[in-house]
């Protein structure tokens, strides 16, 4: 995996997410060839400067709608999946045609949440993208809409792009949209709305500044704020800028690469969500939080909360569990709740039935209650992540973790 750049040439790993509105006309669903060409030129320029670039591209469903001459996206999931099957091939073919003009090879990477639910699959996905970058290829990532079922979908490519950026330890995630930046209010309806240029804490941003997502896509400003939170928590700088001006990416990166940040350079309007330098989520913890679907929840008491949040934190013992919700098996992910609020995720060693029997009990009682004792912990420390407390983001993903 490409490490964070520390050398003087300041090359970066950059993920660029393109929404449907940046790829196809919202009404006719015709591909916006001129805009796509500008994006291709920008990516190739970034590559020539030594940066690694990954595209996360929406547009498969819109391309399918155009090919089948359908007026709008249907609500039935199976119909959407069929349309995606028609459009995805046409979308990647269009990208390949445009990139080929500049002799830039690309690769299609289709992902579902199920593909990264197992740790080994998550590592393989990250390593595959890493190898593509090593070969000088531009990976083009999209959710596999043809296979994803509602329960395990990422839901939108903003989320997918943030997970991809965290998975490959990217430096920047650019979310290209139909507005220049985040505003204090909707600029389409309020002429007094002010641009917000830099944000250090995503929790301080009011999602009511949002603009509506397109009728074809599933996004909107709310999903971008969620993506910004995911990205910055894993050490990725997240930037929102206008998709019709992709060259702004080049200008922003060039400014970030400059040794003189104070020089007077007029940059295009954009919003920069600054990466968290403290409390960044480690790779394994990022996978636990965002790669896995929660199958239930555990409520814990104050003693357990203090034990798992202290500096030399411990694993979760059964004595600290007060309630069990849902039906899940051993080795599945669950939400951890304290005082009615989600505080993190855990990969449990026992099923919901087993934990319900041993909750509130000391570990030495497990064998007498269950008839066996797999481990004294409900969840090991390394498979327990608490929001905002897990630091030291791994520099790379490898397959030899223990």
Curated annotation (Swiss-Prot):
Protein purpose: Catalyzes the transfer of a phosphate group to glutamate to form glutamate 5-phosphate which rapidly cyclizes to 5-oxoproline.
Binding-site residues, ATP: 177-178, 218-224
Keyword Amino-acid biosynthesis: yes
PANTHER family, A to Z: GLUTAMATE 5-KINASE (PTHR43654:SF3)
Metabolic or biological pathway: Amino-acid biosynthesis; L-proline biosynthesis; L-glutamate 5-semialdehyde from L-glutamate: step 1/2
InterPro entries: AceGlu_kinase-like_sf, Asp/Glu/Uridylate_kinase, G5K_ProB, Glu/AcGlu_kinase, Glu_5kinase, Glu_5kinase/COase_Synthase, Glutamate_5-kinase_CS, PUA
PROSITE patterns: GLUTAMATE_5_KINASE (PS00902), PUA (PS50890)
Protein's organism: Schizosaccharomyces pombe (strain 972 / ATCC 24843) (Fission yeast)
Protein name per UniProt: Probable glutamate 5-kinase
Catalytic activity field: L-glutamate + ATP = L-glutamyl 5-phosphate + ADP
Compartment annotation: Cytoplasm
Record EC number: 2.7.2.11
Principal location: cytoplasm
Keywords: Amino-acid biosynthesis, ATP-binding, Cytoplasm, Kinase, Nucleotide-binding, Proline biosynthesis, Transferase
Enzyme type, top EC level: transferase
A cellular component term, taken from the record's GO annotations: cytosol
Binding site for substrate: 58, 145, 157
Family: Belongs to the glutamate 5-kinase family.
């Amino acid at each position: 995996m490409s490490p964070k750049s520390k050398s003087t040439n300041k090359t970066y790993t950059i993920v660029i997410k393109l929404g449907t509105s940046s790829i196809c006309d919202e009404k006719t669903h015709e591909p916006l060839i001129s805009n796509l060409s500008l994006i291709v030129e920008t990516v190739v320029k970034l590559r020539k400067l030594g940066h690694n670039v990954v595209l996360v591209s929406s547009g498969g469903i819109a391309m399918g709608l155009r090919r089948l001459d359908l007026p709008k996206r249907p609500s039935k999931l199976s119909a959407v999946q069929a349309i995606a099957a028609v459009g995805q091939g046409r979308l990647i073919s269009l990208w390949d045609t445009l990139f080929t003009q500049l002799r830039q090879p690309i690769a299609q990477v289709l992902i579902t949440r199920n593909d990264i639910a197992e740790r080994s699959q998550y590592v393989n996905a990250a390593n595959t993208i890493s190898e593509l970058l090593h070969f000088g290829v531009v990976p083009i990532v999209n959710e596999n809409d043809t296979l994803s079922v509602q329960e395990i979908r990422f839901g939108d490519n903003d989320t997918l792009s943030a997970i991809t950026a965290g998975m490959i330890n990217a430096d920047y995630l650019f979310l290209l949209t139909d507005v220049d930046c985040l505003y204090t209010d909707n600029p389409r309806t309020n002429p007094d709305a002010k641009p917000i240029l830099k944000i250090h804490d995503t929790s301080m941003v009011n999602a009511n500044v949002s603009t509506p997502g397109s009728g074809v896509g599933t996004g909107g400003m709310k999903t971008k704020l969620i993506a910004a939170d995911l990205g910055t928590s894993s050490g990725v700088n997240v930037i929102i800028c206008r998709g019709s001006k992709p060259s702004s990416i080049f200008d922003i990166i060039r400014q970030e690469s400059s040794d003189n940040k104070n020089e007077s350079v007029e940059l295009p309007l954009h919003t920069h969500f600054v990466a968290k330098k403290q409390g960044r989520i480690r790779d394994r913890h990022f996978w636990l939080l965002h790669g896995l679907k929660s199958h239930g929840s555990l409520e814990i008491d104050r003693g357990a909360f203090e034990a798992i949040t202290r500096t030399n934190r411990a694993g979760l013992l059964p004595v600290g569990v007060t309630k069990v919700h849902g039906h899940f098996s051993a080795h599945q992910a669950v939400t951890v709740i304290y005082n009615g609020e989600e505080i993190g995720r855990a990969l449990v060693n026992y099923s919901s039935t087993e934990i319900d029997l041993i909750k509130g009990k000391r570990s030495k009682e497990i064998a007498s209650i269950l008839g066996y004792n797999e481990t004294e912990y409900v969840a090991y420390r390394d498979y327990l992540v608490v929001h905002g407390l897990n630091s030291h983001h791994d520099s790379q993903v490898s397959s030899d973790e223990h």
